[in-house]
Amino acid sequence: MKWKVLQLKTQEIKVNNLAKSSLHQPGSLVLRNRIRNNQTISNHQKVYITNLHKDKLKLNNLLRLMKSTNRHMPFRNLVLATGQELALLHNKRKRRKTLPLALFYSHLILL
């Protein structure tokens, strides 16, 4: 299954690296390469996409795709969050020592 909406500009994928360095999340480089090669994104991987608020049409298209393909694609765990909310989630996970954040939120989109 391909995530066809991910034909995004490199600017948005580069910010992925910024999110990775601030939250110490591994595997970002592999994920960026997968996106570039338009490969499948599996359930346990996280996707950071930013600057979507600047392009309302792109965001609406993504949400529409999520709703229409929810049963066929791993979008059930997609979360729209700001950087601050993501940091809070990360800290909560550290305190409670629960499962990795990636297992709860497969795809994170930073607005």
From Swiss-Prot:
Keywords: Cytoplasm, Nucleus. GO terms for cellular component: cytoplasm; nucleus. Its main location: cytoplasm. It is found in: Cytoplasm; Nucleus. It comes from the Eukaryota. This is Uncharacterized protein YGR151C.
